[in-house]
């Protein structure tokens, strides 16, 4: 299987996860909860809906705030994390609601934003 980091990834919110099963995605959300095992956490998107992120290994660092996750959507509509990035909010606040609006537009107009979608000629 090709490395997921090399594949095009659709930007999605929590409601869109069931449409992307077995496909690579990028999910951005606010950390709500970390499972006690450290192998799963919950992110809320710009609509306040939750997405579950699964990890291969337990977290080895403290995470908080806004997190961008790249991974593959599982059959349970969770994201199996390949990598994550913490957004630093020291100087600028990340507007998750505005980001969510952009994600919806990108998905509503695939002819203008084709990244992560199969191309049909």
From Swiss-Prot:
Quaternary structure annotation from Swiss-Prot or TrEMBL: Component of the canonical replication protein A complex (RPA), a heterotrimer composed of RPA1, RPA2 and RPA3. Also a component of the aRPA, the alternative replication protein A complex, a trimeric complex similar to the replication protein A complex/RPA but where RPA1 and RPA3 are associated with RPA4 instead of RPA2.
The gene coding this protein: Rpa3
GO cellular component: DNA replication factor A complex; nucleoplasm
GO molecular function per UniProt: damaged DNA binding; single-stranded DNA binding
Domain of life: Eukaryota
Lineage: Eukaryota, Metazoa, Chordata, Craniata, Vertebrata
Key words of the record: DNA damage, DNA recombination, DNA repair, DNA replication, Isopeptide bond, Nucleus, Ubl conjugation
Record-linked InterPro entries: NA-bd_OB-fold, Rfa2
Localization of this protein: Nucleus
Gene3D superfamilies registered for this protein in UniProt: Nucleic acid-binding proteins
Species, as recorded: Mus musculus
One of the GO biological process terms: mismatch repair
Cross-link for Glycyl lysine isopeptide (Lys-Gly) (interchain with G-Cter in ubiquitin), residue positions: 39, 88
Post-translational modification: Ubiquitinated by RFWD3 at stalled replication forks in response to DNA damage: ubiquitination by RFWD3 does not lead to degradation by the proteasome and promotes removal of the RPA complex from stalled replication forks, promoting homologous recombination.
Function of the protein: As part of the heterotrimeric replication protein A complex (RPA/RP-A), binds and stabilizes single-stranded DNA intermediates, that form during DNA replication or upon DNA stress. It prevents their reannealing and in parallel, recruits and activates different proteins and complexes involved in DNA metabolism. Thereby, it plays an essential role both in DNA replication and the cellular response to DNA damage. In the cellular response to DNA damage, the RPA complex controls DNA repair and DNA damage checkpoint activation.
Name listed for the protein in its UniProt record: Replication protein A 14 kDa subunit
A family per Pfam: Rep_fac-A_3
Family to which the UniProt record says this protein belongs: Belongs to the replication factor A protein 3 family.
């Amino acid at each position: 299987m090709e490395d997921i980091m090399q594949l095009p990834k659709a930007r999605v919110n929590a409601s869109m996860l069931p449409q992307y099963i077995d496909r690579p995605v990028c999910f951005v959300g606010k950390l709500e909860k970390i499972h006690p095992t450290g192998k799963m956490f919950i992110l809320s998107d710009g609509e306040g809906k939750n997405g579950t992120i699964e990890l291969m290994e337990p977290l080895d660092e403290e995470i908080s705030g806004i997190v961008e996750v790249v991974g593959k959507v599982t059959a349970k509509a969770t994201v199996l994390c390949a990598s994550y990035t913490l957004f630093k909010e020291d100087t600028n606040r990340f507007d998750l609601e505005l980001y969510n609006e952009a994600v919806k537009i990108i998905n509503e107009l695939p002819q203008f934003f084709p990244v992560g979608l199969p191309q049909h000629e």
